[in-house]
Regions:
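Short, low-complexity cationic-aromatic patches
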Residues: 8, 70-72, 146
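Helix-adjacent hinge/juxtasegments
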Residues: 71, 81-83
Length: 178
């Protein structure tokens, strides 16, 4: 269409493969107050599998998807969970691996969020710590943790803002306070 400007509105969802959608849903509900939007693929349905699905999703031959669920967590992108009917290829990515290796939850009270994360079955890699450089501020903090199945997530807060360097093209998106 001539003259039409195509604009990206933002990140719609983030996909994550988990060993059990029911267990992952319970974890995200307990840790972050997640709400179920809907199931794309339900366990009672025929698994998503075959050449067409493998091609569309870039899956290895023989991989099947038995359950897909969308979760809403606060005012951010939807989290899309995948449960395979076959064994996953490998362990979750780490920061030292190429590819999407973590996502962060903006929290208002990092101590309380850390406790809730651990009570839900997650494990923190360290205690919450101050942020550095442009993100430094007396009340700004972050901490990384692992979900019960080993995926890396971050809890972060920067109520003192970010000191954007000269030439910064855009402020980072921050979920609005409810």
């Amino acid at each position: 269409m001539e003259g039409e400007i195509v604009m990206t509105r933002g990140i719609d969802h983030i996909g994550m493969t988990v060993p059990s959608i029911e267990e992952a849903t319970a974890f995200f509900q307990e840790a972050f107050g997640a709400e179920v939007s809907y199931d794309v693929q339900r366990p009672e349905q025929e698994p998503m599998a075959g050449d067409e699905v493998e091609k569309q999703l870039g899956l290895p031959e023989g991989t099947s998807i038995i359950h897909m669920r969308l979760l809403r967590i606060g005012d951010g992108p939807t989290l899309e969970l995948f449960e395979l009917g076959t064994e996953p290829d490998k362990e979750p990515l780490r920061i030292s691996d190429i590819g999407i290796h973590h996502f962060a939850f903006y929290v208002d009270n990092i101590e309380q969020a850390s406790e809730r994360f651990e009570a839900a079955g997650g494990s923190l890699l360290s205690p919450p710590h101050s942020l550095d450089d442009e993100e430094d501020g007396p009340h700004n903090a972050g901490v990384y943790g692992k979900t019960p199945w080993g995926s890396l997530v971050e809890l972060i807060k920067y109520p003192d803002g970010v000191d954007y360097p000269k030439g910064s093209e855009a402020p980072r998106w921050t979920p609005p306070k409810n």
